[in-house]
Amino acid sequence: MSNYYRRAHASSGSYRQPQEQPQYSRSGHYQYSNGHSHQQYSSQYNQRRRYNHNDGTRRRYNDDRPHSSNNASTRQYYATNNSQSGPYVNKKSDISSRRGMSQSRYSNSNVHNTLASSSGSLPTESALLLQQRPPSVLRYNTDNLKSKFHYFDPIKGEFFNKDKMLSWKATDKEFSETGYYVVKELQDGQFKFKIKHRHPEIKASDPRNENGIMTSGKVATHRKCRNSLILLPRISYDRYSLGPPPSCEIVVYPAQDSTTTNIQDISIKNYFKKYGEISHFEAFNDPNSALPLHVYLIKYASSDGKINDAAKAAFSAVRKHESSGCFIMGFKFEVILNKHSILNNIISKFVEINVKKLQKLQENLKKAKEKEAENEKAKELQGKDITLPKEPKVDTLSHSSGSEKRIPYDLLGVVNNRPVLHVSKIFVAKHRFCVEDFKYKLRGYRCAKFIDHPTGIYIIFNDIAHAQTCSNAESGNLTIMSRSRRIPILIKFHLILPRFQNRTRFNKSSSSSNSTNVPIKYESKEEFIEATAKQILKDLEKTLHVDIKKRLIGPTVFDALDHANFPELLAKRELKEKEKRQQIASKIAEDELKRKEEAKRDFDLFGLYGGYAKSNKRNLKRHNSLALDHTSLKRKKLSNGIKPMAHLLNEETDSKETTPLNDEGITRVSKEHDEEDENMTSSSSEEEEEEAPDKKFKSESEPTTPESDHLHGIKPLVPDQNGSSDVLDASSMYKPTATEIPEPVYPPEEYDLKYSQTLSSMDLQNAIKDEEDMLILKQLLSTYTPTVTPETSAALEYKIWQSRRKVLEEEKASDWQIELNGTLFDSELQPGSSFKAEGFRKIADKLKINYLPHRRRVHQPLNTVNIHNERNEYTPELCQREESSNKEPSDSVPQEVSSSRDNRASNRRFQQDIEAQKAAIGTESELLSLNQLNKRKKPVMFARSAIHNWGLYALDSIAAKEMIIEYVGERIRQPVAEMREKRYLKNGIGSSYLFRVDENTVIDATKKGGIARFINHCCDPNCTAKIIKVGGRRRIVIYALRDIAASEELTYDYKFEREKDDEERLPCLCGAPNCKGFLN
């Protein structure tokens, strides 16, 4: 049916049921019973009209209905439709009528739309339903509207007032009959459009040619070039939609270039679960072999029951992997929608591929058997001239399979021509077997080695008889519990016999010397002697070649290349070296001269006071090549047996490093390294200035022009050669510096104004260094006019003497306090009254350093640990006493120093022995568990700390990035840790040692733990805490951030979260230069 007929009657509230039903034709168009197609009707009468309604609105309809008066069938068609009653059936309803049922738009009942042809009648039930519908009424079919407007009569197929409507030519005589055209003319400097009468003799021209658009034959357009068709927008499917619902299923299958052998079904399901809710998941197997095809059907559903959500999830899954494919667990899959029985086609395709592979394998096996039979027949015909060594009896099945399977090339050296039992990797991966399972099950056989290879598990035997015995007894009888299916699985072994076991004396292999070779058997004594003679001759020939090269060819070649034989070349070489040395010497002289000139230029008037802009900076260049040689010599000094700690750490796995017994090595390396750094450091600004071009000198203009100087009588400045030498010879303290801010000659002094806010006379005298300071002081005091009386002037000298004496007494008292107590006494600790009157009060931790020696932070680490044979460098008497008491005879044997690498190697061997014993026992037990971190920890000890309570100290020197100790404690869950923390606070335990490992695990070392819990916090720590995995469990390990000397306290940053309440913040007592003041 036409669009116009459907839309024109939509506003009337009811429809007419057409008697003729459209049917599908082969061309894809609707076909009516009278023989006319819908396309013919719409193509002949496709006109647009506008209609005015009474309410003033305007609507546009498509006039696709046939209204020609000449077509009798058309008039009969509309007359028939007008006489019938019932709902109108559009294209969608027409399609639904062929299915037998369509849903009514006016009731919840289903209406049969199976209509008869034009000459037939409707069914009884349908006629009864259609009679209940009200008759259709044309809204605009009134005389009042017909006389005013130009409407179309859909029943008669004619226009109202057709004869009364006139053209615009007949009504308006002012307009030209030939029409008008618009031109663009230049007027008043601007282009304007004008309308002109059109004459028939004027030929029309394409305006695009005037702008040069069509000169090349192609139309210039701004449309985007599309290389492919654009998909139409998806239309939501509802209850009024016709046709099948959108597909909610996807099919996942392996790509052609991917071999999918080891992937679980749950991995596929979990991957596609992110696109929507999966209601059905199915994996398909090969019906012939029951092996998985890795073809999956996934159906999406919606919790709300909306089919559009499920279809959208399936569509997004396909759209995501449409171009690049889907990669799951390293395997590539293709994803498509399940339409038009595509699932069955894919399954049949993969089944056919498997059948072809099986046929090919059978053909290869048949050919191998035929070839083997032919070889046996040929041997029988040749007779028994050569007798082969006897082999153990092998079953036909295992022997034939052994001849087909070969050892991988990378395992030839390890196998070394020995018998092997093989288990396929596909079978092992499917059931998640491991090498330890086979080791435990076959512990009663003489297996040489177990290898886990990408192609499977290989079990190597030293003797064929042992391999055959194991294969016959265990193949098909051995069962191992599957980790994927949770049931015992029968294991079938594949015996691979050695390939070269006949007439082979030496097996070429790259294996280690401890691998066992298969003994070679000879049939007769003559064969053995002949093979031995050949090998001896081969060895003698090889030795002879080496001897000739060393004794004859080598000396002859070296004698021919002697320098004395080529005097001309030597002369040329010496001449070149001499010229090179001269060039270097001249270059050094030029550089030295330039450096002096630049130094003189820096001290002239404009160099010192010419501004601080970057454009005025001169490029500082290093012209001395000797300095480079000097730095290179400094670097070579480090290679003479002493290297920095960083290099020692890098060589940890390559060479043996000895653990330093004292910190001399560290200090020696650090001193040389510091000297090298002082010589080799250069600022970034200098490097930028070196790269800057020398054109800046040319661009700089003279500060003053000679014309102006001559007019004003100013003499030109001439650099004084003698004056510059005086400046250079001056002390470095008084040399001027070209800086943005003037720098003082003397360093600034800080005065203690704690007890008094005024400076004493001694401080004032010490502050005045030279005459310039005295002049400045006079200028400052000139503004102050004191009232001087005879009494004050007479007592002035006495007051100066009194203040001077007070300062000296205070300095003397402070010196006594430092000498006796080690620090100054704080005035806050001085009691204002008697001790009994003051009572008990809490003293802050920062004040305890005045009377507790172990709470003081000094530059050298406080030695609170009593170490045997320890020497204090700061007490020479003690050093002499210990040296005299600890003297040993000169002929004593030097103590052997063990390296850290040897210790790690022995620990690894010990760990391997324990693992072997655990594998032999076969049961998981904690009796043989070994903590590897206990073997690698450094010697440490706890003692009283200068920071807080107890601390941890290093007994030996520790290099940077080395492990120190493990933080050991009781492993508890997070809720238990929170409960214990509250209990500790309630019981009065101020310090709780809770260390978080992850979100769910906390280590509590409060009551059960090691000495690592005594490590204190510091804002500038020398250690750090790391969480590593050892034996499958997370552990907290303390590592060194820098080189740590012996007897130095170990600290690390607690990294507490910032507390919002200031009262709950804990003060930090680390005393570091960058101390934050609080722990949290």
Curated annotation (Swiss-Prot):
Phosphoserine modification sites? S625
Q: Is S-adenosyl-L-methionine among the key words of this record? A: yes
Q: Which residues form the SET domain?
A: 938-1055
List residues, modification Phosphothreonine. Answer: T875
Residues annotated as region Contributes to RNA binding?
A: 762-938
Q: Which InterPro entries does the record match to this protein?
A: COMPASS_Set1_N-SET, Nucleotide-bd_a/b_plait_sf, Post-SET_dom, Set1-like, Set1_fungi, SET1_RBD, SET_assoc, SET_dom
Query: Which residue ranges does the record annotate as region Binds SWD2?
Result: 1-230
Annotated segments matching region Required for catalytic activity: 762-938
Is Nucleus given among the entry's keywords? yes
Residue span, Post-SET domain: 1064-1080
Q: Which biological process annotations from GO are given for this protein?
A: ascospore formation; cellular response to stress; meiotic DNA double-strand break formation; negative regulation of gene expression; negative regulation of transcription by RNA polymerase II; positive regulation of synaptonemal complex assembly; positive regulation of transcription by RNA polymerase II; protein methylation
SMART domains cross-referenced by the UniProt entry? N-SET, PostSET, SET
**Which stretches are tagged as biased composition: Acidic residues?**
674-692
What are the boundaries of the region Binds SPP1? 762-938
Q: Where is the composition biased (Low complexity)?
A: 29-46
Can you tell which superkingdom this protein's organism belongs to? Eukaryota
The places in or outside the cell where this protein is found are: Nucleus; Chromosome
Quaternary context: Component of the Set1C/COMPASS complex which consists of SET1(2), BRE2(2), SPP1(2), SDC1(1), SHG1(1), SWD1(1), SWD2(1), and SWD3(1). Interacts with MEC3.
Q: What does this protein do?
A: Catalytic component of the COMPASS (Set1C) complex that specifically mono-, di- and trimethylates histone H3 to form H3K4me1/2/3. Binds RNAs involved in chromosome segregation, splicing and transcriptional regulation; appears to bind transcripts both co- and post-transcriptionally and binding might negatively affect its histone methyltransferase activity. COMPASS recognizes ubiquitinated H2B on one face of the nucleosome which stimulates the methylation of H3 on the opposing face. Plays a role in telomere length maintenance and transcription elongation regulation.
Give additional notes from the record.
Present with 172 molecules/cell in log phase SD medium.
- From the Swiss-Prot or TrEMBL record, give the protein name: Histone-lysine N-methyltransferase, H3 lysine-4 specific
Q: Which organism is it from?
A: Saccharomyces cerevisiae (strain ATCC 204508 / S288c) (Baker's yeast)
